[in-house]
């Protein structure tokens, strides 16, 4: 009984509370990601590789965006009685990058690419299109929690599926 209501509250109320909490952190620190927040999973591995192979230091700006995005995994008080982590929602990453315009533009892009992958899956049958569609479906379903492109393993997995796994043999 109450577990269902607790789960519903968690899934629908926490994103609002934690978005507000982490929005204040971004505003207080005057952080603007300019795309690095939303695409952290793609960008950070490049700098990490350069740091470890060529000893080129990661720019402080990139490290700051990466750190604040990872800090959302820390448990914070979402209400007087509940602590939670990660439920910042996809909107927060777009907010961190370009504030409210970022939310609008980012969600338009997510909608466009979700529709396009759905259409490609319907008209061009194949495991690659279906896999990419599943990634976008996962992103939409879990948009109340976070954005998958901010997680290195998800972003690299997407690149692997899109460009390597189903590469056509000549």
Indicate where each model-derived feature is located.
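Small-residue-enriched transmembrane helix-hairpin modules in multi-pass membrane proteins
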Residues: 1-110
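Hydrophobic alpha-helical segments
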Residues: 83-170
